[in-house]
Structures are given as C-alpha cells and as structure tokens.
Amino acid sequence: MQKIKSLMTRQGLKSPPESLNDLGAFESLRVPGKEEFRELREQPSDPQAEQELINSIEQVYFSADPFDIVKYELEKLPPVLNLQELEEYRDKLKQQQSAVSKKVADLILEKQPAYVKELERVTSLQTGLQLAAVICTNGRRHLNIAKEGFTQASLGLLANQRKRQLLIGLLKSLRTIKTLQRTDIRLSEMLEEEDYPGAIQLCLECQKAASTFKHYSCISELNSKLQDTLEQIEEQLDVALSKICKNFDINHYTKVQQAYRLLGKTQTAMDQLHMHFTQAIHNTVFQVVLGYVELCAGNTDTKFQKLQYKDLCTHVTPDSYIPCLADLCKALWEVMLSYYRTMEWHEKHDNEETAAAAEGSNVMSTEEATFDRGYVKKKLEHGLTRIWQDVQLKVKTYLLGTDLSIFKYDDFIFVLDIVSRLMQVGEEFCGSKSEVLQESIRKQSVNYFKNHHRIRLDELRMFLENETWELCPVKSNFSILQLHEFKFLEQSRSPSVSPSKQPSATSSKPVTLFEQYCSGGNPFEIQADHKDEETEDVLASNGYESDEQEKSAYQDYDSDSDVPEELKRDYVDEQTGDVPVKSVSRETLKSRKKSDYSLNKVNAPILTNTTLNVIRLVGKYMQMMNILKPIAFDVIHFMSQLFDYYLYAIYTFFGRNDSLESTGLGLSSSRLKTTLNRIQESLIDLEGSADPTATLTAAEERKEKVPSPHLNQLVILTSGDTLYGLAERVVATESLVFLAEQFEFLQPHLDAVMPAVKKPFLQQFYSQTVSTASELRKPIYWIVAGKAIDYEQMLLLMMNVKWDVKEIMSQHNIYVDALLKEFEQFNKRLNEVSKRVRIPLPVSNILWEHCIRLANRTIVEGYANVKKCSNEGRALMQLDFQQFLMKLEKLTDIRPIPDKEFVETYIKAYYLTENDMERWIKEHREYSTKQLTNLVNVCLGSHINKKARQKLLAAIDEIDRPKR
C-alpha cells in the first residue's frame, strides 16, 4: 500500500492513507483483481474528470497515520438523515474509489516490466546462494581430513622454530642497543670535525632506533643521553652560525643550514642569524674604537672597557680619528659583505630547490619547504634595512663624538670621502639614501665649510692685493682637468679600478662594490691607497726636466723656469693621453718647442697665479660637493662668492671710473651694474672696521662679508709708455674671462648635483654673473682708449682751423695728420705690449673700437666748437674726415668704422632746410645739446633766418628738458 502511495505521489496525486487493515473495513475499497482491472481500463475515461475526482478526496485519507474510517464517516453524518443525500454521497465515494482504483491499475501495469526483471534477479541470486552452500560444505569436509592428518610432533617442531626466530630477533636488538650506547664517541668526533649535518643525522637516527626499543628498561637512560647530546649540538651550531657574520664561508654555512634543516628549525636559524649580525655590529665597532682609544691612552687601564660606545667615541684623538674611521668602515664592510653573501647563498639554493621540487612528487613536503623559503626570503630582505640602520647609528655616533671643525681641509675631505663611500655601500646594500649619515655630517660640513670659506675669501683678498698681474705661462692645451683638484671628475666617469686591472668588458652595466669586492679586498682600503697614489701622481715629473740637453733646448724657445710648480705637475698630452717620451732628439725637441711657442702665442690661456688658485679652490669645493651632495647648494653658493669677489676686484682695480657713465655710451650694461651692486651689497664690507655700536645682527652679517681689495702699489696704471697698464689690464680682465669659461665648463657638473628647488639660483648665477665677465672689457679698456690718444690736443688744433673759407680746398687740415700720428703711435705701443702679453683679438678690437669711437666723437665735438662755417668749410670737414678714414683703414681691420655715420650725419645736417632740420633734431638725440645748438647757430644767415633759429632752439630745449 505504501508503494502505491509513493507511486501516486510521484505522479502528482494524493493517495488515500488507508492501510490494508483499513481496507478490511470497507469491502468497496479493496484492491481490484485482474478482471476488474481490465474492466476498469475498458471503461471510457475522462482524465480531467478523474483527476478532479481524485483531487476532491479529503486530505485525511492521504494521511500516513492510521485512523478509523467508519467512525470518521459516521461522525460526519448529520443528526437528521436524508436518504437521498446519503445515496448521493455514497455514489460520490464510489466514483472516487473507481477513479483511485483505475489510477492504481494504470500505475501497476506501468511498473509490470520492472517487476518481472526484479523477479528474475531474485531467482538468479537464489541459484548463486545454493552454489555457495555446496562450496562451503566441501571446504569443511577437506579441513576435517587435514586435521586428522597432522601429529603432535609436527606441532612441537613448529613451536621450537618460532622460539628460535624470536631469540635471533632479540640478539639483533641487543647488538643495536650496544651500538647505540657507543654512539656518543662518534658524535663527539663529528662535532670536532664540524660535521654538524652528519652528527644531527646520526643523533636523529639513534633516537629513532631507540624509540623502537623503548620497551627495554635501559633505553630510557639512552634517550635522555641522546637528547642532551642533541641540545649540545644545537649550542655548537649556534656558535658556528655566529661565525658567519664576520667571515662568510660557503662550505661552513652550507653545513650549518643543512644541520638546521635536519632539525626542522630553518626559521629559528634565520631569527638567530639576524640576532648574531646585530651583535656582531655592536661588538665590532666597540672593539675597533676601544683598540684605538687604549692605544692613544698609552696604558692598560680597563676603565675604557666599561664605557658605553657613545662615551668611548669621545676619547678618540684627532690624530687617530681617520685611521679609526677607516678601520671601523672596513670592519662594518666585512659584516655587510657576509650578509650579502648569505643572501646570495639562499637565492642560489632556493632556485636549485625549486627546480628539484618541480621534479618531485611529495606535495606536502614541497609546500612546507616553499613556506620556509618564503619566510627566509622575507626575513633576509627585512634584515637588510635593519642591519644598515644599525651600521648608520654606530657610524653616526662615531662621527658626532669628535669636533671636525679643527681638521685640515684634506683630512676633512678624506673623512667625507670615507662616509660617502659608506653611503654608496648602503645604497647598493639595501637601496637606502642613508638619511641618518647624511644628516649627521651635513650640519658639521656646513659649519666647517663656512669657516673654511671665510678663511679662503680672506686669502683671496690677500692674493688679489699682492697680485702684480703678471702672466702665468701655461701650455696651449692647458685644461683644468690636468689639475690634481679636478682628477675626481675623470674618476667619477670611469671605474674605480686601475686601468691595468680593468676588464675589457663590453657590458655597460655598472659593477657594484659588492660584486667587485665579493671575492676579496675592501673598498675602504682602496680609498686610502688611492689617496696616496694621487699624491705621488701630482709630484711626478713631466719627463723633460731630468735631461739637461733637452732642458736647454726647451729653454732656447720658451723657458718655463718661471712657471709655477703646480703647473709643471702631471702634464699629459690630451690628444694621445701619453706622457712625453724622454729619449727624443734635440732637433725634434726644438721643433716641438717652436710649435708649442707658436701655439702659446695664439691660444695659450691668459691667467695669473691668483686665477689658478681660485680654480684650484673651486676644484676643492667641488670635491666636497661631490662627496656630500646634500650641501651642494651651500658649496655652489660659496663658489659663486669666489667668482663674485674676483669679478668685483677686477672691476675695482681696473674698471671703476665715474667719468665713464657721463659719456652716455652705455659702456656698463644694466645687467653688469646690477651684478656689481648685488656683489657690493651682499659680499663687500665697505666699513673696513668693526663698529662697536652695531647690533648683533649687523655684526653677524658683517662676518659674511669681505673688505674691498686694494690694488698693489707695484701696479702702475698711469704711465703712457705702457698704455696705462694695458698689459696688467689684459691679464686681469682676460683671466676673469678665462675663469668664467671654466665655470661654464663646470656648469653641467654643478647642475647635476644641485637640488631641483635650488636650480634657479644656479641659472641666475650663470645668466647674470658669469656671462657678464666679458662685459667688463668695455669699461676697463675704455680707460686705456681715453688716455692713449691726446683728444684735447686735437680739439685745440681744430679750433685753429678757419672754416668760413670761400673756396673749396683740396688739402686736408693738419689736425688729421696729428690724429693719425696718434693712432700710429698707439698701434706701435700696442705691438710693444703684445710682446709681453698676448692680446686676444676681441681685446684688440675693443681697444681700436673705443679709440676710433672717441676720435670720431672728438671730431664732432671739434666741429661743434666752430663759430662760423661756410658751405666750403663743410666740404673741407668732409674732406678731412674722408682722409682720416682712408688712412685709418690701413691701420686697423675693424669694419665698419665705429661711429662713422655719427660724424657724416652731423656734417651733412648743415645742408638741411628749416623743416628737415627740425625733424632731424628730433630724430637724432644721440648728439649733445651743445652740438645741436652750434649746428643751428652756424647755419644762421646762410639758409636759416632768426625766426627759424628760435624755433629750432626751442625744439632742442624741449628735447633737453627731460635730461635735466
């Protein structure tokens, strides 16, 4: 019945819940037979109507709980029975029964094939069980036969054999236990041999074997002994791990790592390793500093050993400061190199293990190993920053323990060089910018450099005041890179190894310090050696001085006996890079010196000893800036002050002349004036002595300033024979131009280290100061030009000329010859000066331009002094000027002649009509009021009347009014 209900449920029907017992209550609800099924199927059916009948059956009939159907139906009857209603209800129940029976019949017929198939399977199973029963019966019969065939003796033999096997096993166990008891001797030997993996492997195997025999009473004591041995191995292993921190050995470290891996303590080993590195840094720096302190103290007092590291650093003497710092950095380098090689080892073995794991099949062990490798990698990467931070703090404490302001410049530079190399190590070690080290030395460097710079400025003033402005002869191919102070520029562009050891590798990838010194050596040892080598290079001979024959030939043409010693050092040909060979013939040397002399005359730089000192000072400043880039701005600012002071001194000595500005020729550009005013306000102490009433702020400001320099009394600038000190003026001015050129050459190097926010200062310095150096030529050489020609004498000669002639003259006036004679004399004296000092073409052109410009303006001034002039007189003026130009062009190559139009335009203005002259006066404001007024007065009576004269004079006055 349950099966029928489940079938009806899957068909979406609600089956009545009556059981077989319930069916007995109503005969009408019994299961129909086959005949009845057939009749039910043959009856015409309406599926929809049947479904509605089934749906109309009450829910209680589908309940799984048993209940009394008869009682249920009787209780439903009303108190008053109605026969018709009862019959209708009965018919309804019959219809519902019929519908359910028909549905059940359909479902049974539908499942008939499955029933047949299941019945066949049951029959087959029954057959198999019967066969199994037969086999079991046969087996029991055979067992009984075998049991009856064995005797008691056979069973006894088997028991003895079993006992024998047990005794053999016991003997093996006893021998193994005996071997385990003697294992401690072998373990001690292996520990002495530092075979930690083997010792641990043996100990673990013994423990594993002992656990097999734990049922023996003697094994418990052995287990305890093995555990103690294992702990002893771990202690020795930790000691071995600590040795890695100062001297990394691949084989040693490989054994240690294998041992920790066998113990399953790879992560613990890494934690211990970092602790040992931290301890190694502390112990190393303390021992190094303690050694120097005790050495300098000269006694064996143990009080220093009880001091803290910070207090110990204050006891380092200045003499031992640099060696101690170098040894400190060497020792710290060894620690960091060991850490670097440790990371290399792990990286290499990680790759090997990853490749091996890819071929293996043990997934669980591979995952665990991968996790360990990941932990070790992260720990090592994190340790980089931590270790470098410890190194920085230790070195910072050492640096701040001594006052560096008392050090000599070279010693201070060497300290900075060591610290800079250490910061380079830090950047390669972990990518750190070493803020701790930079900050610790930046303030000291700035303070040191301020004091140093102040002393250098005072020295520069002393040099300038003692300078006689004599030419310092140098080679035609002289370059500041040949100077010792600028060697670092070439070294910074080449590898730090010597050329003989430099590999001929084509790869452009830079070699790090760790790669370079991984197999041996120390970058801080190279640093000290490098300094010694440079000192020897500076003192080296140039290869000519040792041979007297060659030296005499050299002196025949260009003796360099007066060349400063610093310029004789380390001369190398720029074209070949080779030192001149000593074994050359006298003739070859002579011809070479002739060509050198010629080059010197044409191209040799013009500079003085003071200029050279400034250049050397700039090189030293750049060395400090290159080593300590955070103070680059301060250093460049001080460098600019060196140039400013040199420029101001040249202007003060040779270019300051109030009469220059009155000419109105714009000899000093507005940019040059602004620069000079800025220098005077910011750098020059004009008071000369301290004012006791000055405020503290003013006193501090004056400390930053330098008194204005005074020209050496030996320099004579008033002699006409020397063209008023032209040689000294040329040397001074052109040395400034040369200095500016060197600053231009160094600009890319300065720009590379200047902080981005400060680069506008550098750009302004170059655009407003360095570029104005050549502009000093005009005011300085103008003073020579103003005195070299006797312009006053020419004016007197012009005043004696009669200009109101009535006929056209064919002969020029005598003042023209006098002026040309002055120019010839000027040219002669200029040639005399050029024998002492090479006069560059730009200087020669400026001198000639100034002289010609002054001469032409003097001519106009002379014409403006004329009281009466006729048309023929004006023609005579033109004749004189043309004659002057024709002869002048033979003396100079300057084209066009300066201010030529200035004279010609003034002469031609005489012929202008009233209206044209008024317009001309307004357009030509380059002429003075006197010159314009004289022009109008001279024209009066010829072609201008008095009324027109008044009008023109009023126009001139109107033009002149804004100038007052």
Curated annotation (Swiss-Prot):
Residues 1-25, 532-563 are annotated as: Disordered. There is a cross-link at residue 963 (Glycyl lysine isopeptide (Lys-Gly) (interchain with G-Cter in SUMO2)). GO terms for molecular function: SNARE binding. One of its GO terms (biological process) is endocytic recycling. There is a cross-link at residue 963 (Glycyl lysine isopeptide (Lys-Gly) (interchain with G-Cter in SUMO1)). InterPro entries: Syndetin_C (IPR019514), VPS50 (IPR040047), VPS54_N (IPR019515). GO terms for cellular component: EARP complex; membrane; perinuclear region of cytoplasm; recycling endosome. Residues 81-107, 216-244 form a coiled coil. It is found in: Recycling endosome; Membrane. Disulfide bonds: none annotated. The modification Phosphoserine is found at residues 15, 494, 498, 559, 561. Its main location: other. Keywords: Acetylation, Coiled coil, Endosome, Isopeptide bond, Membrane, Phosphoprotein, Protein transport, Transport, Ubl conjugation. The modification N-acetylmethionine is found at residue 1. Component of the endosome-associated retrograde protein (EARP) complex, composed of VPS51, VPS52, VPS53 and VPS50/Syndetin. The EARP complex interacts with EIPR1. Interacts with VPS51 and VPS53 in an EIPR1-independent manner. Acts as a component of the EARP complex that is involved in endocytic recycling. The EARP complex associates with Rab4-positive endosomes and promotes recycling of internalized transferrin receptor (TFRC) to the plasma membrane. Within the EARP complex, required to tether the complex to recycling endosomes. Not involved in retrograde transport from early and late endosomes to the trans-Golgi network (TGN). PANTHER family: SYNDETIN. Belongs to the syndetin family. This is Syndetin. It comes from Mus musculus (Mouse).
